[in-house]
Amino acid sequence: MENKQQQEQKELATVRAGYPVFDGGVTDEVRQSWKQAHGRVVAVDIYDDMAGERHIGYFRRPSMDTMSAVSAVSRQDELKGAEVMFKNCWLGGSPLVQNAAILKTSALGALGELFATCHTELKNL
């Protein structure tokens, strides 16, 4: 038997499945070319529940140069540092992800998770 929260999540997923998708017209061919050029590419799905829309932004993993720039700028202003990350990793997608503050902020939160996708272990020899 599902609890109330699980039921609400299922209902929300059903509603969101009907949202129109805005992805900037990115095709499978374009995504494949990005993968060949940049290696790993991620899609960030942003659901704007107030507008009833789903926006997709495509990003590459940050390079060492990008991470260095983000680190340097973030010392003065964390939001500007996140903007550096966004601009340097953005490949394409819904133009609103670049221009609407709420959508962009949501995408930035997801980009922060890119740093947590690899895990390390240190072993004494």
Q: Where in the sequence are the language-model features?
A:
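Short, charged/polar N-terminal "headpieces" of proteins
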Residues: 1-62
